[in-house]
């Protein structure tokens, strides 16, 4: 409302010719006012007859001597210029909306800027008021403090927002990892079940072939027995149907032969002696698989090192070794090179590697304490594979004899009244439900343990050496024995 009044006042004190605030205003008899310069310049165009002029707005004539200065309008214009009428927003700020006066005072109680008329009104009577200039700096400082506070809060809000986004991303990753783990766990279960199913079916097929083979043999025996009896029957019938001479000729031998005939019953296979299928312990199998997965985290890159170039056949990539026979030049005797070491040597930490022994009928592998132990030129016999000699190994002999080699055991023999003491290596039989095509070896140097896993059978523990005495660096050990098929170091993703 106040700004509209100011606009109206401005229109009243605006020159109709130049459309600016009146400068040195002159008023005519008709009541219209113009800038002195504007109305003087308009004299020539508005002359109607000599000595008279006309108003540019209403065209009423006026004598030139009747132009008079309007001091009242000049004062109004001066006041308007002080108020700075041009920006309307400025008018709203600087002028009181109720009274149209300049806002020069600040009411402390209401916290508002007021004019001098507001100060005298009933609404603000008794309030503490100050000039705007007096309190502006104080409140500017207060607002600056509040501004800094809000900027800090804005930073905190942005950080909270970022934290939420980060937490959201973290949860997404965590959930995705959980999904991946769940899928991996169930895939592992399915793989285990598939493997167990395949093994059970293979065992059944082997059992079927074995039983049917023996039954076929039994059937053949029964056929031969039946044929033999048929021959005797035919002989008896011929004698009975023939002459007396044919009847009596060798009759005692025939009767004796018939009486000695004993029916051989076929071999039977009792169901109760069959291997009974039992549902596998999935929980236990999964735990075993997890243990294998855990030790596989310590997979080490192992290469093979021969003790002498001519005594072992090692592949170019130093990942495969096979048996080689060689003849000693001086003695002409056949020598065998059984073992090679792996590199690097191990003096601390946890290490894991896997060896492919598929289709081999003999092998020995594990850990050896030194080159001197491994490179036995005469070929290490079974009696040498003992922890006290620096070997922690397991092996296969004669295609189906799996064993772990422990320290020798003392025996006391009494012969002819005398006592003798002998030492024999302790060979621990290892029973495999599934023959390992791939064997994992895990060495924990600080825990002094060497463990062997049947990777082919979902990672079941084959054997574990505990309380091992590692006083020197140890090496992976590989012996292809006398089987010509190779032993191959596996890569992690093979």
Swiss-Prot record:
Disulfide links within the chain: none
RING-type zinc finger segments: 15-59
Name recorded for this polypeptide: Tripartite motif-containing protein 5
Quaternary structure annotation from Swiss-Prot or TrEMBL: Can form homodimers and homotrimers. In addition to lower-order dimerization, also exhibits a higher-order multimerization and both low- and high-order multimerizations are essential for its restriction activity. Interacts with BTBD1 and BTBD2. Interacts with PSMC4, PSMC5, PSMD7 and HSPA8/HSC70. Interacts (via B30.2/SPRY domain) with HSPA1A/B. Interacts with PSMC2, MAP3K7/TAK1, TAB2 and TAB3. Interacts with SQSTM1. Interacts with TRIM6 and TRIM34. Interacts with ULK1 (phosphorylated form), GABARAP, GABARAPL1, GABARAPL2, MAP1LC3A, MAP1LC3C and BECN1.
Modification comment: Degraded in a proteasome-independent fashion in the absence of viral infection but in a proteasome-dependent fashion following exposure to restriction sensitive virus. Autoubiquitinated in a RING finger- and UBE2D2-dependent manner. Monoubiquitinated by TRIM21. Deubiquitinated by Yersinia YopJ. Ubiquitination may not lead to proteasomal degradation.
Region described as Required for interaction with GABARAP and for autophagy: 186-199
Recorded metabolic or biological pathway in which this protein acts: Protein modification; protein ubiquitination
Keywords: Acetylation, Antiviral defense, Autophagy, Coiled coil, Cytoplasm, Immunity, Innate immunity, Metal-binding, Nucleus, Phosphoprotein, Transferase, Ubl conjugation, Ubl conjugation pathway, Zinc, Zinc-finger
EC number: 2.3.2.27
EC top class named in words: transferase
Phosphoserine modified-residue sites: 86
Coiled coil: 140-223
GO terms assigned for molecular function: pattern recognition receptor activity; ubiquitin-protein transferase activity; zinc ion binding
Pfam families xrefs: SPRY, zf-B_box, zf-RING_UBOX
Gene3D superfamilies: 2.60.120.920, Classic Zinc Finger, Zinc/RING finger domain, C3HC4 (zinc finger)
Zn-finger region bounds: B box-type: 91-132
Family of the protein in this entry: Belongs to the TRIM/RBCC family.
UniProt superkingdom: Eukaryota
Protein role: Capsid-specific restriction factor that prevents infection from non-host-adapted retroviruses. Blocks viral replication early in the life cycle, after viral entry but before reverse transcription. In addition to acting as a capsid-specific restriction factor, also acts as a pattern recognition receptor that activates innate immune signaling in response to the retroviral capsid lattice.
Substrates-to-products reaction catalysed: S-ubiquitinyl-[E2 ubiquitin-conjugating enzyme]-L-cysteine + [acceptor protein]-L-lysine = [E2 ubiquitin-conjugating enzyme]-L-cysteine + N(6)-ubiquitinyl-[acceptor protein]-L-lysine
PANTHER family, per database record: E3 UBIQUITIN-PROTEIN LIGASE TRIM
Species of the source: Plecturocebus donacophilus
């Amino acid at each position: 409302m106040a700004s509209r009044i100011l606009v109206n006042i401005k229109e009243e004190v605006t020159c109709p010719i130049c459309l600016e605030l009146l400068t040195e205003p002159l008023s005519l008899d008709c009541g219209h006012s113009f800038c002195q310069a504007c109305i003087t310049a308009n004299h020539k165009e508005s002359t109607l007859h000599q000595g008279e002029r006309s108003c540019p707005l209403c065209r009423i004539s006026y004598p030139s001597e009747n132009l008079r200065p309007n001091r009242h309008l000049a004062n109004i214009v001066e006041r308007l210029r002080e108020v700075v009428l041009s920006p309307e927003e400025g008018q709203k700020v600087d002028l009181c909306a109720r009274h149209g006066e300049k806002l020069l005072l600040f009411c402390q109680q209401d916290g508002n800027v007021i004019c001098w008329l507001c100060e005298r009104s009933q609404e603000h009577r008794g309030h503490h008021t100050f000039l705007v200039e007096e309190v502006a700096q104080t409140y500017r400082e207060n607002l600056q403090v509040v501004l800094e506070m809000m900027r800090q809060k804005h930073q905190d809000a942005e950080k909270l927002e970022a934290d939420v986004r980060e937490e959201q991303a973290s949860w997404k990753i965590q959930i995705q990892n959980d999904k991946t783990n769940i899928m991996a766990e169930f895939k592992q279960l399915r793989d285990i079940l598939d493997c167990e199913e395949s093994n059970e079916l293979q065992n059944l097929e082997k059992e079927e072939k074995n039983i049917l083979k023996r039954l076929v043999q039994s059937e053949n025996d029964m056929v031969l027995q039946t044929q033999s009896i048929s021959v005797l029957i035919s002989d008896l019938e011929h004698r009975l149907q023939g002459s007396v001479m044919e009847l009596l000729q060798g009759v005692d031998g025939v009767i004796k032969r018939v009486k000695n005939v004993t029916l051989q019953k076929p071999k039977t296979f009792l169901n109760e002696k069959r291997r009974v299928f039992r549902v596998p312990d999935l929980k236990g199998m999964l735990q075993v698989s997890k243990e294998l997965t855990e030790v596989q985290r310590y997979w080490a890159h192992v290469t093979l090192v021969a003790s002498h170039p001519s005594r072992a056949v090692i592949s170019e990539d130093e990942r495969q070794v096979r048996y080689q026979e060689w003849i000693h030049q001086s003695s002409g005797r056949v020598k065998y090179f059984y073992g090679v070491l792996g590199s690097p040597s191990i003096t601390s930490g946890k290490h894991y590697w896997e060896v492919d022994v598929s289709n081999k009928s003999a092998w020995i592998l594990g850990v050896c304490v030194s080159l001197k132990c491994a490179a036995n030129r005469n070929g290490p016999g079974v009696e040498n594979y003992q922890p006290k000699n620096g070997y922690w190994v397991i092996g296969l002999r004669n295609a189906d004899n799996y064993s772990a080699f422990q320290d020798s055991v003392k025996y006391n023999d009494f012969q002819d009244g005398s006592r003798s003491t002998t030492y024999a290596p302790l060979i621990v039989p290892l029973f495999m439900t599934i023959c390992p095509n791939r064997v994992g070896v895990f060495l924990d140097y600080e825990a002094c343990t060497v463990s062997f896993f049947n990777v082919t059978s979902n990672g079941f523990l084959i054997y574990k050496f505990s309380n091992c005495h590692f006083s020197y660096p140890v090496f992976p050990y590989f012996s292809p024995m006398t089987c010509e098929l190779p032993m191959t170091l596996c890569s992690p993703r093979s």
